[in-house]
Each structure stands twice: as structure tokens, then as C-alpha cells.
Amino acid sequence: FSFERIDLHLDENKKQSIVQNCKDRNYTSFGKYNVERVETIDGFKFFFDDDTWLMIRASGTEPVLRTYSESSSQEKCFDILEDTRKTLLD
């Protein structure tokens, strides 16, 4: 398995808006990755149907969202993180 992280630097209002959307369970997919279930311990961990996951954690000290992914390959991890970036910011 591969594990990757990308930090999204954005303004505080956008960060809080995304966190609220996570709390409200407004994200049912990130690009082609459909959310099967969500855990809310230490952030928002979205599990997909193919043994992969994505975690979104808001920094408590700066306007940053940290996104983490685990998958069977590094390429797929980065694909998940890119689809996540597009979903959250576009």
C-alpha cells in the first residue's frame, strides 16, 4: 500500500465551509471515487469501495486542509488527492 499527503492552502472561510460540508456529510464522492462510509475520529476519513481511503483534517493553527490518501499504488493515491482537490475547490 501507498500513503500520500497534500496540503491545501486556502482562506479561513473556505476552510470552515469545507469542514462544515464534511460534518453535514455533503460529500458522497470525490471524482470517480464513491464514499462508502465516513469516520469522524481525528478528522474526516472517507472510505471508498476498493479498500482505499481519504482523510481530510483542518489545521488548528493555519488556513490549511491536510488531505491524506492510502491506496494500492502511489499513482492511485495522487489520483484520489487530485480528485479531492477538484471536488473541494472547484
Segments and roles (model prediction):
Residues 1-90:
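Phosphate-binding and adjacent anionic-ligand microenvironments
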